């Protein structure tokens, strides 16, 4: 995709003048997007909507049959979590759930390495067995995304990542790698996705989670409660 930018710059130099196709802000701002498709068989997901709890170290999305934990590897007050937005939708009469976690991050290539080391965990609401399938991806610029999927109830999953500058996305005409989920493809997801309702962290919230989930809550909140 960056080759498009280089080609335009080369053509402009040959013609005797320089045209910068992007603004400085577009060059320095990165759009980070993580897309997940989760499929179940034994039970149906109730489309109750989702709730979002944000902490300094990450975020928690609850509802729609799953808990999603996302956090980095930074310590107390070291760096705020980079991703702030999550939207979800339920498909296939309750047998599938689609989620997008994203944000625009300025100077992503310069932030602390700990903030670029991100873990995404999908944990089922009604199952207490701690059994996760693990996947690790190394992405540019030095971003590591680890996904842990609760295999005790999830029967299939797929995911896609996109980390590009706004300049690259505008010139290429692509905002993110597309991910089909339960026969819904590409931009069609926009017709169904709903943003999670924001909740403030509370002292009692640890009691809402299973014992094996509480370490993830602590990583999100960085033990502030």
Curated annotation (Swiss-Prot):
Signal sequence region: none
Alphabetized Pfam families for the sequence: Pox_T4_C (PF04490), Pox_T4_N (PF04491)
InterPro entries (UniProt xref): Apoptosis_reg_M-T4, M-T4_sf, Poxvirus_T4p_C, Poxvirus_T4p_N
Family statement drawn from the similarity comment of this UniProt entry: Belongs to the poxviruses B9 family.
Stated name of the protein: T4 protein
């Amino acid at each position: 995709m960056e080759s498009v930018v280089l080609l335009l710059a080369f053509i402009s130099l040959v013609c005797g003048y320089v045209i910068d196709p992007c603004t400085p802000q577009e060059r320095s701002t990165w759009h980070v997007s993580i897309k997940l498709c989760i499929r179940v068989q034994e039970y149906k997901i109730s489309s109750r909507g989702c709730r979002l709890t944000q902490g300094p170290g990450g975020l928690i999305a609850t509802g729609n049959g799953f808990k999603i934990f996302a956090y980095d590897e930074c310590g107390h007050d070291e760096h705020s979590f980079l991703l702030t937005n999550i939207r979800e939708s339920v498909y296939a009469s309750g047998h599938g759930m689609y989620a997008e976690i994203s944000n625009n991050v300025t100077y992503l290539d310069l932030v602390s390495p700990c903030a670029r080391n991100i873990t995404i965990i999908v944990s089922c609401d009604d199952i207490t067995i701690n059994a996760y399938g693990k996947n690790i991806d190394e992405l540019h610029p030095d971003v590591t995304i680890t996904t842990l999927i609760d295999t005790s109830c999830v029967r299939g999953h797929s995911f896609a990542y996109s980390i590009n500058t706004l300049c690259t996305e505008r010139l290429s005409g692509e905002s993110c790698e597309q991910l089909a989920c339960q026969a819904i493809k590409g931009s069609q997801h926009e017709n169904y996705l709903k943003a999670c309702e924001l909740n403030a962290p509370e002292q009692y919230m640890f009691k809402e989670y299973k014992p094996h989930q509480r370490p993830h809550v602590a990583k999100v909140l960085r033990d502030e409660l």
